[in-house]
From Swiss-Prot:
Assembly behavior: Part of the 50S ribosomal subunit.
Gene that this sequence comes from: rpmD
Keyword set, alphabetical order: Ribonucleoprotein, Ribosomal protein
Organism lineage string: Bacteria, Pseudomonadati, Pseudomonadota, Alphaproteobacteria, Rickettsiales
Name of this protein: Large ribosomal subunit protein uL30
The species this protein was found in: Rickettsia rickettsii (strain Sheila Smith)
CDD domains found in the cross-reference section: Ribosomal_L30
UniProt keyword Metal-binding present: no
GO cellular component: cytosolic large ribosomal subunit
Stored NCBIfam families: rpmD_bact (TIGR01308)
Length: 63
């Protein structure tokens, strides 16, 4: 059985200024705090849910 979890690369492309407080907290939870900062995270359901809430601020790439 292959239990390999795919990773996704998430890059913040828009500012969090003027966004709702919960959206800013989600960005911090994803490890993003500056424009053009990228993180590589496991493609789990919890990460997918967080990304879905702030997808308008991010660029997402499968790895």
């Amino acid at each position: 059985m292959n239990n390999k979890i795919n990773n996704i690369k998430i890059t913040q492309v828009h500012s969090a200024i003027g966004r709702k407080y919960d959206q800013r907290l989600i960005l911090v939870g994803l490890g993003l705090n500056k424009i053009n900062k990228s993180v590589i995270l496991a493609n789990t359901n919890s990460i997918k849910g967080m990304v879905k809430k702030v997808k308008h601020l991010l660029k997402i790439e499968n790895m």
